[in-house]
Amino acid sequence: MMTRIEVLFPEFCSLFADSSNVRYLEKCLPDAEFVYTSYMDEPLFVAEKPDLIYMGAMTESAQEKIIKKLMPYKERIAQLIAEDVPMLFTNNAVEIFGQYIENEDGSKIEALNLYPIYAKRDMMHRFNCLLRGSFDDIQIVGFKTQFTMAYGDTDKYPFIHVDKGTGMNKETVNEGIHDHNFFATYLVGPFLVLNPLFTKYLLNDVMKLDVTLAFEPVIMEAYERRLKEFLDPKTQY
């Protein structure tokens, strides 16, 4: 049976080279079908169960449009999460699944409210940092560039335990959301290219495929060099 991967709203959700996550998956899975769902389309996941659902970074205005687009499918998304359908969301896509997003003036954009977090925007101050952490026994590296921090119960569904850098906010070592096969993280890079061990875990353990990573010797060498750099005490986070 052909593997089907749904890429949500690629015309909006490709900031910070996040589209390279999908391009890398295409190289790893040359026989898979990639369904690119535009904003005007009904998502594939409404009637079917894709083998993976992916959405990347977007502008704040696009984020508000996408919340409105997905709100009618909130219960369906919750059902798919409970049924272990693999999902990966990067950068500010994570905020769509929280309770709300708060603007500087205190006004709130209601989100899907699937997880007990909320985000606060600070559009005059972009936050950037490196991050090193772990998911189970996999070491994770990446970059953050964002106008928001997330608060609330960040302990309930943590994805990455942060060793160096900043978690969902400056007071927590938890980064992202992990629930069943739902993974969401603020990290960019692109995430799957920077973290081949997690990509291998996603494809083979979560999606139950049996694949070899594309360009594995090169991408592993780059990962090991970056990990060494991130482990250097002189590296500034």
Labelled PLM ranges:
Residues 52-56, 88, 184-186:
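Structural motif
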Residues 1-79, 193-196, 200-237:
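N-terminal beta1-alpha1 cap of cysteine-dependent amidohydrolase-like domains
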Residues 104-175:
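Pocket-forming structural segment of enzyme catalytic cores
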Residues 58-134:
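Cysteine-nucleophile active-site neighborhood
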Residues 60-61, 94-96, 149-151, 191-193:
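Glycine-rich nucleotide phosphate-binding loop and flanking beta-alpha elements
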